[in-house]
Curated annotation (Swiss-Prot):
It comes from Drosophila pseudoobscura pseudoobscura. One of its GO terms (biological process) is generation of precursor metabolites and energy. It comes from the Eukaryota. This is Glucosamine-6-phosphate deaminase. It catalyses: alpha-D-glucosamine 6-phosphate + H2O = beta-D-fructose 6-phosphate + NH4(+). The keyword Metal-binding does not apply. The active site is at residues 72, 141, 143, 148. Belongs to the glucosamine/galactosamine-6-phosphate isomerase family. HAMAP family: GlcN6P_deamin. It is found in: Cytoplasm.
Length: 274
C-alpha cells in the first residue's frame, strides 16, 4: 500500500487526474484494447473530474477507448433526478469528454429485477476484461461505495439497505426531507473492487481522518470496509493534510519520505506498488 499525502484537497484532485491520465496513456488503448476504469461519485472526486476534462480539452488524454463502471446508484430515483448518480456523472464528467455512451456502465436503480441487474453488472465487468484502475472515495465511517460498516469484505454487487447515519447525511441533498431520501442503493461489493488490478482511494478533510487512521494503522475490520484494501496488491491512497490528523507522526513522516523520492510528474505505476 502507498499513501500519498498532499497539502490540499485541490492538490489531491490534480494529482489523481494526472495519475489517471498517465495510466490511460501508458496503456495505449485502442479498438481492440480498452482501458477499464472504475469511478466514484460525491464531492471528493469532483476536482479530479474537472482536471481530467481540462486534460481532454488540451488533447492530452482521450476516453474514446475507455470503458467505465460506476460504483453505485440509488434505487427508485429517476435517472434525470439531480441527485441520481447517472445525472451526476453525465453532468460533471461524461458529457465533457469523448467517451462513447455504450462504454459507460452505471447500475440501473429502476430495473424491474434488481438482483439480475447486479449480476449483469458483474458479468459486464468480466466481459470487459476486469477493471484496470478502480477509483473510490470513503465516508467518515470508512465505507467505500455503499459498503457500510459490517459489510462482507468479499461481497459482490448487490442491493444494499442504507444505514440510518447515511440517510441522515444524505438528507441535505433532498431538501432535508428524510421521506425523499432513497432507502436502498445498488452497489459494487468490496470483493468486486478488490478484483481490480489497481485501486486508488481519495480521502480529504479532517472529518475522514479517523477513517484513514483505521485504514492505514489498524488491522482489517469489516466495520471499516476501506481497511480491506490493506490486502490488495496494488492500493494507492491519496489524501490531504487534514485527513492525516489521526495518524501517528512517524507514519506521516514515513510516507512523506517515500513521496520525496518520487517525481510526481514522472511517477510510474510500478513506483506505487508494494
Amino acid at each position: 500500500m502507498r499513501l500519498v499525502i498532499l497539502e490540499t484537497s485541490q492538490s489531491v484532485g490534480k494529482w489523481a487526474a494526472k495519475y489517471v491520465m498517465k495510466r490511460i496513456n501508458d496503456f495505449q488503448p485502442g479498438p481492440n484494447r480498452y482501458f477499464v476504469l472504475g469511478l466514484p461519485t460525491g464531492s471528493t472526486p469532483l476536482g479530479m473530474y474537472k482536471e481530467l476534462i481540462e486534460f481532454h480539452k488540451q488533447g492530452k488524454v482521450s476516453f474514446q477507448y475507455v470503458k467505465t463502471f460506476n460504483m453505485d446508484e440509488y434505487v427508485g430515483l429517476p435517472r434525470d433526478h439531480q441527485e441520481s448518480y447517472h445525472f451526476f456523472m453525465w453532468h460533471n464528467f461524461f458529457k465533457h469528454i469523448d467517451i462513447e455512451p455504450q462504454n459507460v456502465h452505471i447500475l440501473n436503480g429502476n430495473a424491474p429485477d434488481l438482483v439480475a441487474e447486479c449480476n449483469k453488472f458483474e458479468e459486464q465487468i468480466k466481459e470487459a476484461g476486469g477493471v484496470e484502475l478502480f477509483i473510490g472515495g470513503i465516508g467518515p465511517d470508512g465505507h467505500i461505495a455503499f459498503n457500510e460498516p459490517g459489510s462482507s469484505l468479499v461481497s459482490r454487487t448487490r442491493v444494499k439497505t442504507l444505514a440510518q447515519d447515511t440517510l441522515e447525511a444524505n438528507a441535505r441533498f433532498f431538501d432535508n426531507d428524510m421521506s425523499k431520501v432513497p432507502k436502498q442503493a445498488l452497489t459494487v461489493g468490496v470483493g468486486t473492487v478488490m478484483d481490480s488490478k489497481e485501486v486508488m482511494i481519495l480521502i480529504t478533510g479532517a472529518h475522514k481522518a479517523f477513517a484513514l487512521y483505521k485504514a492505514i494503522e489498524e488491522g482489517v475490520n469489516h466495520m471499516w470496509t476501506v481497511s480491506a484494501f490493506q490486502q490488495h496488491a496494488n492500493t494507492l491512497m491519496i489524501c490531504d493534510e487534514d485527513a492525516t490528523l489521526e495518524l501517528r507522526v512517524k507514519t506521516v513522516k514515513y510516507f512523506k519520505g517515500i513521496l520525496r523520492d518520487i517525481d510526481e510528474g514522472a511517477a510510474t505505476q510500478d513506483g506505487y506498488k508494494n
